[in-house]
Design a protein with these regions (language model features):
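Conserved glycine-rich cofactor-binding loop
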Residues: 9, 16-17, 40
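Conserved glycine-rich Rossmann-like NAD(P)H-binding loop of the short-chain dehydrogenase/reductase
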Residues: 30-46
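Active-site loop of short-chain dehydrogenase/reductase
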Residues: 8, 56-57, 84-85, 130-142
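Substrate-binding pocket helix/loop in short-chain dehydrogenase/reductase
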Residues: 99-100, 107-112
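Conserved NAD(P)H cofactor-binding loop of Rossmann-fold oxidoreductase domains
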Residues: 91-96
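The beta1-alpha1 cofactor-binding region of Rossmann-like NAD(H)/NADP(H)-dependent oxidoreductases
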Residues: 41, 62-74, 105
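A short, exposed helix-loop element centered on a Lys and neighboring polar residues
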Residues: 123-124
């Protein structure tokens, strides 16, 4: 286990698979307490359990980043669990399901809402916690 993130609490959106899950594992290996957030609870809990099985500290908190109330509740749960938030890794998002020339505007709007508005909601909700922690970091994936 590393020490670069020892004592830090990191929220990772889209933490139930892919880059988010791998980032959660890496942060935990560096000593962070990891809060994985995603909509798919079963997958997210499996990743959290895997991190804990490997000697790290992780919890899963269900969250739809495109829903302001869901984000507010999830961030407060994260802060209550470990008393602080030091890092936000905005990773939740996705692409359209159809090819560009055929993409309906509704699909485009859904992608924009999750990928951009969700990043805004999360960053805004976490910001006061970063200030209270004396600083921190927000990382936005694209």
């Amino acid at each position: 286990m590393g020490e670069r993130l020892k004592g830090k609490v990191a929220i990772i959106t889209g933490g139930n698979s892919g880059i988010g899950a791998s980032t959660g594992q890496l942060f935990a290996k560096e000593g962070a307490r990891v809060v994985l957030m995603a909509r798919r609870e079963e997958q997210g809990q499996m990743v959290a359990n895997s991190i804990c099985d490997d000697g790290g500290e992780a919890i899963f908190v269900g969250c739809d980043v495109g829903d302001h109330d869901s984000v507010s509740r999830a961030v407060e749960k994260a802060a209550a669990a470990w008393g602080r938030i030091d890092l936000l890794f905005n990773n939740a998002g996705g692409g359209a399901g159809s090819s560009f020339p055929d993409e309906p505007i509704e699909e485009w709007q859904r992608v924009i809402h999750t990928n951009l508005t969700g990043t805004f909601f999360m960053s805004q909700a976490v910001w006061p916690h970063l200030v209270n922690a004396g600083g921190g970091a927000v990382v936005n994936m694209s």
